[in-house]
Amino acid sequence: MHSNNNIHIISIGGSVMHDLAINLKKNGNVVTGSDDKIYEPSKSNLKKNNLYPKKLGYHKENITKNLDFVITGMHTKSDNIELQTAKKNRIPIYSYPEFIRKSSDNKHRIVIAGSHGKTTVTSIIMHVLKKNKIKFDYVIGGRANGFNSNIKI
């Protein structure tokens, strides 16, 4: 699921979604995306990685039959024209959490939950794994020092 796919991300401008798009592209996928508003630093990061949408907004022509699947961001509404077009064309659709779960189906998971300290604890675990040269994927709510992204899958 991680390489050689044609993927469209609806609501690509979010902090997590744009990092996901960049990560998927670096893994060898063809990635496109759409959003109605994109702010910094997402805007610069998407442009730097040639992932910034050609025009802002949601357009049914963004959903082509050669897509392997579509990933939706948390702000994607059920009446979104791209989402409706993907459904009509029977293109598999994953929400962000569904995609992360599917991406980690065959992996050991460490999940940090709670009200406070999740990013800090996750960051500590990431640094321990990195220091011990253990390969790992991660999804973290904020930026951890020494890591360029909040997601690597």
Spans of model-derived segments:
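ATP-dependent carboxylate-amine ligase
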Residues: 1-41, 45-53, 66-70, 86-91
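Phosphate-binding loop of NTP-binding sites
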Residues: 4, 23-26, 47, 61-65, ...
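Glycine-centered flexibility sites
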Residues: 11-16, 33, 57, 114-117, ...
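Short acidic-hydrophobic, aromatic-tinged amphipathic segments that line or gate anion-handling sites
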Residues: 53-58, 94
